[in-house]
């Protein structure tokens, strides 16, 4: 057995019950895609007895057009979790050190720990100080950050510390494109950027992600990649979403407007603005609010293990967020 697994703490899923009567605002999924796009995807699902195209050329061509990055610097995966997994596996050896600003997306900890590596959590304000003292092999950042929603420019650090690799998880970049370094990553010897179709694109169910990096690291990733991991549905849906990004952008714009409305409604509360599709609310009665919302069929995420008395709320419809704001105001 891999002895490193003795140190792995399993990722704890939220208490989610699948039901059409529930409103899910706990996992930061994006808004549903338009019906016309769903129909086009269904119409193209005609060949499921063969493996999907392992080259994924049509999908990569669409990503090249969307991102402006040559497809030779892009690879696709079964979700960005898989992309992150491959990135860590390529870069890390046992006993290497990884620095992660805290709080952050915790799913990556399983991969890092299973490889026998050490993790240092630090505040984002002391990141450079910890790079100097801890000398990590890898720094992982989610930009915008999950769950705080702040953005961070990684490139100055990548230039200043060429001996450290920087993995930047841009899962929420569609909600604040100015923060993205996706079109710059391939120019650096020590930068990998991952993205997903789960958030801004509203396609969490298909599990589709992608990454970009320089040709040297990309060749290492491709040397161990399972090129059949992107299924036919995911490849088709990804292409259709990219072809009609105008509709996706409309959903994103609406989400950002709803978020502003929600924050304005709760301006007297300790609520963190965010460059993603969620906000973090701090309240001494957070657990009571979470339970009342749950009793009404609305799920939000308790984040008190990161910051005491906090909940993370994914943006839903305007009506959803108005209802939630009115409930919070009772406390």
What are these regions (language model features)?
Residues 4-6, 90-142:
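PLP-dependent aminotransferase-like
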Residues 124-176:
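Active-site phosphate-binding strand-loop segment of PLP-dependent enzymes
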């Amino acid at each position: 057995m891999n002895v490193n697994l003795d140190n792995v703490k399993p990722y704890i899923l939220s208490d989610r019950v699948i039901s059409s009567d529930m409103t899910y605002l706990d996992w930061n999924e994006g808004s549903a895609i338009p019906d016309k796009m769903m129909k086009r995807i269904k119409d193209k699902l005609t060949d499921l007895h063969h493996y999907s195209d392992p080259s994924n050329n049509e999908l990569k061509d669409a990503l090249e057009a969307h991102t402006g990055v040559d497809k030779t610097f892009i690879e696709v995966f079964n979700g960005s979790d898989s992309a992150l997994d491959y990135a860590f596996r390529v870069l890390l050896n046992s006993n290497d050190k990884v620095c992660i600003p805290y709080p952050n997306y915790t799913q990556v900890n399983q991969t890092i720990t299973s490889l026998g590596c050490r993790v240092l959590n630090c505040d984002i304000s002391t990141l450079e100080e910890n790079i100097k003292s801890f000398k990590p092999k890898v720094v992982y950042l989610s930009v915008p950050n999950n769950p705080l929603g702040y953005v961070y420019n990684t490139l100055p650090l990548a230039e200043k510390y060429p001996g450290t690799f920087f993995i930047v998880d841009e899962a929420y970049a569609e909600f604040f494109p100015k923060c993205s370094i996706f079109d710059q990553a391939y120019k650096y010897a020590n930068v990998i950027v991952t993205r997903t179709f789960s958030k801004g694109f509203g396609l969490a169910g298909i599990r589709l992600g992608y990454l970009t990096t320089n040709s040297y690291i990309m060749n290492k990733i491709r040397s161990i990649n399972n090129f059949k991991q992107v299924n036919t549905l995911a490849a088709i849906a990804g292409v259709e979403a990219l072809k009609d990004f105008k509709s996706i952008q409309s959903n994103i714009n609406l989400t950002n407007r709803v978020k502003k409305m929600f924050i304005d409604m709760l301006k007297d509360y300790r609520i963190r603005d965010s460059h993603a599709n969620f906000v973090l609310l701090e309240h001494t009665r957070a657990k009571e609010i979470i339970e009342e919302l749950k009793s009404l069929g609305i799920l939000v995420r308790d984040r008190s293990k990161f910051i005491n008395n906090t909940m993370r709320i994914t943006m839903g419809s305007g009506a959803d967020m108005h209802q939630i704001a009115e409930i919070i105001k009772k406390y």
